[in-house]
């Protein structure tokens, strides 16, 4: 019998990677069809290699993508399909609004230097990747009733890609794209300050493109400070190490900064050591602005309920706190104000809360 969900009500998810949310069966299908060698020939076997049960370092985790991304990247049909199936997956998890992120360049094989995953050069550009993902998400939204929007990722080790990423954010604003992100290895010294990234974020500010940044996951509070002060981020991806700098944390609390928290992910990537108190407990106790998210459910062999079960069982989270954090997630979403209001109304109704509960940002 399936486990009863820890929070069986509509949910909002803001931090999840498309390329970390692919069905194993879909990877196998395109691997076979395209003649690309995979480390196993069954879904279960594939999960045993790609999936994680115990903590690894972040670089070891990132190496997991090398196993399966060649089966998907560069294939138009596969890219549209993974976006469509992603929405179906979220519908089953009780998500009513999701922002899914990905790097257009890491799914392309043309007009990208270097070409990723040892692919031969083809004719699928980052521009067309964004169009295909948008189509898949829109068809998924129509068929499964989950509102789905996308965030385009710059990669820390490829600042030369970033100017194109912000241009694609502008071009596809009407086709699901709502924001820009900076992802990848944040331990690369000074990577937040590389001119390609800084210029892309300056252009995003100028053009009214929303901004989030992976910072303080395994990097220091200094990386968080750079994300806030230099890249002008509106949300923090993870942000756990903000707590190393109490003055910074207090400032961000006052500014109502939103933390995109991924509890199960933080355990498996070693971003959080289980013998220490998880940052999310402090955020809960302070009634701060944060959400719960899966990050990369394929690799973490998880669903959103995994994160809710973990916080309920191990950290004393209550139904009331789950409601509060989802309302904060909706308020901190990158939707236009009218659509945000509709989403909040849906949540208030489902949670049996009066709409006047929206008074006060942190409820």
Swiss-Prot record:
EC top class, as a word: hydrolase
Free-text cofactor note: Binds 1 zinc ion per subunit.
NCBIfam families: aden_deam (TIGR01430)
Pfam families, sorted: A_deaminase
Phenotype for residue 69 to A: Decreases enzyme activity by reducing maximum velocity; reduces ADORA2A modulation
Enzyme Commission number: 3.5.4.4
Residues with N6-acetyllysine modification: 54, 232
Assembly notes: Interacts with DPP4 (via extracellular domain). Interacts with PLG (via Kringle 4 domain); the interaction stimulates PLG activation when in complex with DPP4.
Record note on what altering residue 20 to R does: In ADASCID; loss of activity
Protein name (record): Adenosine deaminase
Positions bearing the site annotation: Important for catalytic activity: 238
Organism: Homo sapiens (Human)
Record-linked CDD domains: ADA (cd01320)
GO biological process: adenosine catabolic process; adenosine metabolic process; allantoin metabolic process; alpha-beta T cell differentiation; amide catabolic process; AMP catabolic process; AMP salvage; B cell proliferation
Name of encoding gene: ADA
UniProt-annotated site: Important for interaction with adenosine receptors and increasing their affinity for agonists, residues: 58, 62
A GO cellular-component term linked to this record: lysosome
Cofactor: Zn(2+)
Induction info: Up-regulated by hypoxia.
InterPro entries: A/AMP_deam_AS, A_deaminase, A_deaminase_dom, Ado/ade_deaminase, Metal_Hydrolase
Biological role stated in the UniProt entry: Catalyzes the hydrolytic deamination of adenosine and 2-deoxyadenosine. Plays an important role in purine metabolism and in adenosine homeostasis. Modulates signaling by extracellular adenosine, and so contributes indirectly to cellular signaling events. Acts as a positive regulator of T-cell coactivation, by binding DPP4. Its interaction with DPP4 regulates lymphocyte-epithelial cell adhesion. Enhances dendritic cell immunogenicity by affecting dendritic cell costimulatory molecule expression and cytokines and chemokines secretion. Enhances CD4+ T-cell differentiation and proliferation.
Activity regulation info: Inhibited by Cu(2+) and Hg(2+), coformycin, deoxycoformycin (dCF), 2-deoxyadenosine, 6-methylaminopurine riboside, 2-3-iso-propylidene-adenosine, pentostatin, naringin and erythro-9-(2-hydroxy-3-nonyl)adenine (EHNA).
Result when mutating residue 155 to A: Decreases enzyme activity by reducing substrate affinity and maximum velocity
């Amino acid at each position: 019998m399936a486990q009863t969900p820890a929070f069986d009500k509509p949910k909002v998810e803001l931090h999840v990677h498309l390329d970390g949310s692919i069905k194993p069966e879909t990877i196998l299908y395109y691997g076979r069809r395209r003649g690309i060698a995979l480390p196993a020939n069954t879904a279960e076997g594939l999960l045993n290699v790609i999936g994680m049960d115990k903590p690894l370092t972040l670089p070891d985790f990132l190496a997991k993508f090398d196993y399966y991304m060649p089966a998907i990247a560069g294939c138009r049909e596969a890219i549209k399909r993974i976006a469509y199936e992603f929405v179906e997956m979220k519908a089953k998890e009780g998500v009513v609004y999701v922002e899914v992120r990905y790097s257009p360049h890491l799914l392309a094989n043309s007009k990208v230097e270097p070409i990723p995953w040892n692919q031969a050069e083809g004719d699928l550009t980052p521009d067309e990747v964004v169009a295909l993902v948008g189509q898949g998400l829109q068809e998924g939204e129509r068929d499964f009733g989950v509102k789905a929007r996308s965030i385009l990722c710059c990669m820390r080790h490829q600042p030369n890609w970033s100017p194109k990423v912000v241009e694609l954010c502008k071009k596809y604003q009407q086709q699901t794209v709502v924001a820009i992100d900076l992802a990848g290895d944040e331990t690369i010294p000074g990577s937040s300050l590389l001119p390609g990234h800084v210029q892309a974020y300056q252009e995003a500010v100028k053009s009214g493109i929303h901004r989030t940044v992976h910072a303080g996951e395994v990097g220091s509070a200094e990386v968080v400070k750079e994300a806030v002060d230099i890249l002008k981020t509106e949300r923090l991806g993870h942000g756990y190490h903000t707590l190393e700098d109490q003055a910074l944390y207090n400032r961000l609390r006052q500014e109502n900064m939103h933390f995109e928290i991924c509890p199960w992910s933080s355990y498996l990537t070693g971003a959080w050591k289980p013998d220490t108190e998880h940052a999310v407990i402090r955020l809960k106790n302070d009634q701060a602005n944060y959400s719960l998210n899966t990050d990369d459910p394929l690799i973490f062999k998880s669903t959103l309920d995994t994160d809710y079960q973990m916080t309920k069982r191990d950290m004393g989270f209550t139904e009331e706190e789950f409601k509060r954090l989802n309302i904060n997630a909706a308020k901190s979403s990158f939707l236009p104000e009218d659509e945000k209001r509709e989403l909040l109304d849906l949540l208030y109704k489902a949670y049996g809360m009066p709409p006047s509960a929206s008074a006060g940002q942190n409820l």
